[in-house]
Amino acid sequence: MPTTQQLLRKGRKVLQKKSKVPALKGSPFRRGVCTVVKTTTPKKPNSALRKIARVRLSSGFEVTAYIPGEGHNLQEHSVVLIRGGRVKDLPGVRYHIVRGSLDTQGVKDRNKSRSKYGTKKPKAGAAAAKK
């Protein structure tokens, strides 16, 4: 415990909070170009082929980002928008690609949680024709 005199002289040091998404540099989103698009397997006990992309950002960083949803149209040199948000069972993946913006298309035939996957509202006739 410091004395009152020591506190007057030095004061308390404020701890700096470490960013969980340093590559965004304080922005909500960043634009980037895909360098590699591949699949990887998650940690135990999960099993799947998760789609990920290595992205070179406008901030100069190169990060690994997750591609959410079923199916995607990304390939090398695709321009994508990145947001923060880790994937719990993929170590080192701390960013998500935003679906439905820039070169990334929205998820096809998605009806629920459409805004999260960049899917436009289906036409009234199209929904009736499917049934």
UniProtKB/Swiss-Prot annotation:
<comment type="subunit">
    <text>Part of the 30S ribosomal subunit. Contacts proteins S8 and S17. May interact with IF1 in the 30S initiation complex.</text>
</comment>
<dbReference type="GO" id="GO:0015935">
    <property type="term" value="C:small ribosomal subunit"/>
</dbReference>
<comment type="function">
    <text>Interacts with and stabilizes bases of the 16S rRNA that are involved in tRNA selection in the A site and with the mRNA backbone. Located at the interface of the 30S and 50S subunits, it traverses the body of the 30S subunit contacting proteins on the other side and probably holding the rRNA structure together. The combined cluster of proteins S8, S12 and S17 appears to hold together the shoulder and platform of the 30S subunit.</text>
</comment>
<comment type="function">
    <text>With S4 and S5 plays an important role in translational accuracy.</text>
</comment>
<feature type="region of interest" description="Disordered">
    <location>
        <begin position="1"/>
        <end position="22"/>
    </location>
</feature>
<keyword id="KW-0694">RNA-binding</keyword>
<feature type="region of interest" description="Disordered">
    <location>
        <begin position="102"/>
        <end position="131"/>
    </location>
</feature>
<dbReference type="GO" id="GO:0019843">
    <property type="term" value="F:rRNA binding"/>
</dbReference>
<keyword id="KW-0687">Ribonucleoprotein</keyword>
<dbReference type="GO" id="GO:0005840">
    <property type="term" value="C:ribosome"/>
</dbReference>
<dbReference type="GO" id="GO:0006412">
    <property type="term" value="P:translation"/>
</dbReference>
<keyword id="KW-0820">tRNA-binding</keyword>
<dbReference type="GO" id="GO:0003735">
    <property type="term" value="F:structural constituent of ribosome"/>
</dbReference>
<dbReference type="Pfam" id="PF00164">
    <property type="entry name" value="Ribosom_S12_S23"/>
</dbReference>
<feature type="compositionally biased region" description="Basic residues">
    <location>
        <begin position="113"/>
        <end position="131"/>
    </location>
</feature>
<comment type="similarity">
    <text>Belongs to the universal ribosomal protein uS12 family.</text>
</comment>
<keyword id="KW-0689">Ribosomal protein</keyword>
<keyword id="KW-0488">Methylation</keyword>
<feature type="compositionally biased region" description="Basic residues">
    <location>
        <begin position="9"/>
        <end position="20"/>
    </location>
</feature>
<dbReference type="GO" id="GO:0000049">
    <property type="term" value="F:tRNA binding"/>
</dbReference>
<dbReference type="InterPro" id="IPR012340">
    <property type="entry name" value="NA-bd_OB-fold"/>
</dbReference>
<dbReference type="InterPro" id="IPR006032">
    <property type="entry name" value="Ribosomal_uS12"/>
</dbReference>
<protein>
    <recommendedName>
        <fullName>Small ribosomal subunit protein uS12</fullName>
    </recommendedName>
</protein>
<feature type="modified residue" description="3-methylthioaspartic acid">
    <location>
        <position position="89"/>
    </location>
</feature>
<keyword id="KW-0699">rRNA-binding</keyword>
<dbReference type="InterPro" id="IPR005679">
    <property type="entry name" value="Ribosomal_uS12_bac"/>
</dbReference>
